[in-house]
Amino acid sequence: MIEIKNLHKVFNKKLHVLNGIDYKIEDGEKVVIIGPSGSGKSTFLRCLNLLETPTDGQIFVDGVDITAKKTNIDKVRMGMGMVFQHFNLFPHFTVAKNIWFSPVHHKLMTKEEGKKEAMRLLERVGLADKADAYPSTLSGGQKQRIAIVRALAMKPKVMLLTNRPQPLTPKWSVRFLTL
């Protein structure tokens, strides 16, 4: 599904953060990138969905070079769910609206379909009772589950998380892998 060839990222022409990464990730494969703080893990993920422009190299998704100049970056990003260290839930939206807003806004589903999908996902992560709550009332683990299902609501081919699901209980960490 994803093939990375000779990926480099240099900041300010002198800080070489990514240095010739070659890697292939197959469909359904789960990959964890481990390293000390500042070692380029988040930069690597940001390059994969083109939030950072690689300095050199190529990234192929399903055989398509997404680093090519003609690439529709928005289309690439819609196929990759990304959950950041800070979950960035919309504070003025309910939990359910945080989930259904983007798929409806991008016309992937109707508002009615989006609301049904939000409830289905909330049920899968044990938070259906929080649908009408606001993010400020949630625990860290609950916020992370909402951020994950918000990304899943876009039906991405790939999920990228900049940090492991640490606020999740061991039970939810395992269940996350099957969502």
What are these regions (language model features)?
Residues 2-3, 8-179:
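ABC family nucleotide-binding domain
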